[in-house]
Design a protein with these regions (language model features):
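N-terminal binding-site loop/beta-alpha segment at the start of enzyme catalytic domains
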Residues: 1-75, 294
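Beta/alpha (TIM)-barrel catalytic core signal, keyed to glycine-rich beta->alpha loops juxtaposed to Asp/Glu
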Residues: 3, 129-295
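N-terminal small/glycine-rich loop or linker at the start of catalytic domains
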Residues: 7-25, 78-96, 125
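Acidic (Asp/Glu)-rich catalytic clusters
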Residues: 7-8, 65-76, 113-117, 146, ...
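Short, acidic/polar
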Residues: 27-40, 100-116, 162-165
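Alpha-helix N-cap and loop-to-helix initiation/capping positions
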Residues: 28-35, 58, 93-104, 130-137, ...
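Active-site groove signature of glycoside hydrolases
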Residues: 113-132
Length: 295
């Protein structure tokens, strides 16, 4: 499995295991979570993607309960903060909102460290752009989180280029990634400047929902599904692996985040790295996704 360098102290596996729905599994036992992580490690997938809000603010603890020192030393943990929703530890709030204040960032970091039973976060992301963000306050807080050793690196999620530039202007530490939605179902970042912005900066993006939340395989686009099936059959992999390989083929060094609770599916995540994707194949899939040929 290829690895991507985000800064001088942090590398992550090219494919990332997403734990968004880990709390939705009928089995959240320590043994089952450990089996999921081990299935990832067997393929060279060492990076686990979390967020404080996942599972109604319970997913981090589910992972933490399963982390032995040996497992912790083999993985990188990504987590996110700034979404406050009326559930879990925020059940008393009256409205869902974003909070990028220093106080909230530090409280969130402490919660994450305690729930996951770890002494540092490998990568902390601001989960969503906050309309009330004071970029100097937020930037200084992120700088402090890194300087204190509580996070090895910081980044953002769902930021547009202007959101990124604003926050970065208030920081000394370099942001190392932007986790955005990208897939054959959501391909606008390839043309709206989001990827171009990150490429210009030399920043590897992360891609959430790289299979369109499963909609890719249930859409009315039969042409796209047939192309994925044909390419997969020729290379001995399933359609999902081909769809993820489409992202891997882009020169921006995209890190797809794949989430599933099915252990057999987890064991196949690494297949995407085996797929060969030339330019014509890439554009054949893109054409089907667009619904028309390129101009």
């Amino acid at each position: 499995m290829d690895r991507i360098k985000l800064n001088d102290t942090l590398e992550m596996s090219r494919l990332v295991y997403g734990m968004w729905r880990i709390g939705d599994d009928t089995d959240t036992s320590i043994a089952h979570i450990q089996n999921k992580v081990s299935a990832c490690l067997d393929q060279g997938i060492t990076t686990m993607d979390q967020a404080d809000i996942y599972g109604g603010y319970a997913a981090e603890e589910i992972l933490g309960n399963a982390l032995t020192p040996e497992l912790r030393n083999q993985i990188e943990i990504v987590t996110k903060c700034d979404i406050v929703a009326p559930m879990g530890r925020y059940a008393d709030v009256s409205v869902k909102y974003y909070d990028t204040s220093r106080a909230h960032i530090f409280a969130s970091v402490e919660h994450s460290l305690r729930l996951m039973k770890i002494d540092h976060i490998d990568l902390l992301l601001i989960h969503r752009p906050d309309p009330l963000m004071d970029h100097n306050e937020t930037g200084a807080a992120l700088d402090e989180v890194v300087a204190s050793g509580k996070a090895r690196a910081v980044g953002v999620s769902n930021f547009r280029p202007y959101d990124w530039d604003l926050l970065q202007s208030g920081m000394k530490t370099k942001l190392v990634t932007n986790q955005i939605e990208m897939s054959l179902m959501c391909h606008t970042p390839f043309t709206n400047g989001d990827l171009a912005h990150l490429q210009r900066l030399g920043v590897p993006p992360m891609a959430w929902s790289p299979l369109g939340g499963g909609a890719l395989f249930h859409s009315s686009n039969t042409g796209l599904r047939e192309k994925l099936t044909k390419i997969g059959a020729a290379q001995g992999v399933d359609e999902a692996a081909v769809a993820v390989a489409w992202l891997l083929a882009h020169p921006a060094s995209i890190l797809p985040v794949l989430g599933t609770n099915n252990l057999d599916r987890i064991k196949q995540i690494g297949d995407a790295a085996k797929v060969e994707m030339d330019r014509q194949t890439w554009f054949a899939l893109y054409t089907e996704a667009l619904g028309h040929e390129v101009a």
